[in-house]
Amino acid sequence: MFKKFQIHLLDNFPHLKNQKILLALSGGLDSCVLLSLCLKQGLNISIAHCNFQLRGKDSEDDALWIKKLADKNKLECKLKRFNTEVYAKNKKISIQMAARKLRYDWFDELSVKHNYEAILVGHH
């Protein structure tokens, strides 16, 4: 899998090798595999994790696990807690749309503030 990723990366995104990258890490399989591949490739990444507070203690546990994973790999880790349900209600949008808006607005904010040149998200 790594060899295919490496070839795809070099063929389609050669500029990423020298860029400061923000990697969105949900804790799910897709984003964790992406993190592993990026670490193996030696990319300059920082982690961003959104806690949408939709799953109670499980949401908090995910954030703690991601912080430990970042520390273990000596990666900068940005964590943010959102009041997603209130935001969705106030904007009269679905929880999914609210989470998407909150997530990508925050990623844009981080990119400007910390000069990230690319944002990677793991979705199948």
Residue positions per predicted region:
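Core alpha/beta nucleotide-donor-binding catalytic domains of modification enzymes
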Residues: M1-H124
